[in-house]
Amino acid sequence: MDTYNIISLLLVGFIWGGTNPLIKRGSEGVSKVKKDNFLSQIIYEFVYLWTRPSYTIPMLINLSGSVVFFYTLSKVDISLVVPISNSLTFLFTSLMGMLLGEKVLHFKSYLGMIFVLAGVTICVSSKF
């Protein structure tokens, strides 16, 4: 695995993890949309979400992370891409949530992040 692929994996984790809390914030209020039947409910929820830039912009950025993910998947072994990108997504989601004031991270959260980084480092170094 070369440096470019490592950067791609970091980028996927950063994009996915960084946008998850923003998508959550942008989707606030969708549960208040109430319609009489199932199909109308789905349509109105879709319209509600996609007409709000606070949801749409982070979602589109998040989807661009999927493009980077699939590109990286074509270049790197799947046994590395999936666990590394998912682990880094968790890490960046936690950090972004903390930056946005969603929750205060405790010792166990930081310890978990250290373990994630150690695991990612082991996975990456095993392929050099």
UniProtKB/Swiss-Prot annotation:
Disruption phenotype: No visible phenotype.
Residues spanning the membrane: 3-23, 53-73, 80-100, 104-124
Classification via Pfam families: TMEM234
UniProt name for this protein: Transmembrane protein 234 homolog
UniProt-listed PANTHER family: TRANSMEMBRANE PROTEIN 234
Domain of life: Eukaryota
Cross-referenced InterPro entries: TMEM234 (IPR018908)
The entry's keywords: Membrane, Transmembrane, Transmembrane helix
Membrane topology category: Multi-pass membrane protein
Signal peptide start and end residues: none
Locations listed in the record: Membrane
One GO cellular component term: membrane
